[in-house]
C-alpha cells in the first residue's frame, strides 16, 4: 500500500454534509485495509479565484495509506458527487501525521484569541456586577 495526501473542497451550502462525507470516504479506505494517518477539517475558506461563481469552499485534508483500487474508488466518488468542487490526490513517500501548516496557524490564532476573550468576559462580568 502507498501513502497519499488528499484534499477536497466542498460547496459551502453543503458544509453540514461534510462530516458524513468524511465518514463515507474514510470508510472506503478502512474497508480496503487502509489507514487514515491524518484528518483535518479546515472549514470554510476563501478561494483564490471564483469556482462556479463561489468565493468560499469547505476544505478537508486526509493523509492515508491505501491501495490503488481504494484511491480509484475515492476519485470516482469525488467525480460523481456534485458537492465536491475540486479534489487533489497526491502520492507521498511516507505517512504524514503531524499537524499541517493550516492547522498550526489556526491553533495559534485560536490560542491568541482565547486569553483576550477571557479578559473581555471578565471585564463585562465586572461591569455587570457594578
Curated annotation (Swiss-Prot):
Name of the encoding gene: rpsF
Chain spans, region Disordered: 96-130
Signal sequence segment: none
Membrane-crossing segments per the record: none
Coiled coil: none
Protein family membership: Belongs to the bacterial ribosomal protein bS6 family.
Role: Binds together with bS18 to 16S ribosomal RNA.
Cellular component GO terms held in the UniProt record: cytosolic small ribosomal subunit
CDD domains: bS6
HAMAP family recorded: Ribosomal_bS6
Protein name: Small ribosomal subunit protein bS6
Ranges of Basic and acidic residues composition bias in the record: 104-122
Organism this protein belongs to: Shewanella frigidimarina (strain NCIMB 400)
Keywords (A to Z) from UniProt: Ribonucleoprotein, Ribosomal protein, RNA-binding, rRNA-binding
One of the protein's GO biological processes: translation
GO MF annotations, alphabetized: small ribosomal subunit rRNA binding; structural constituent of ribosome
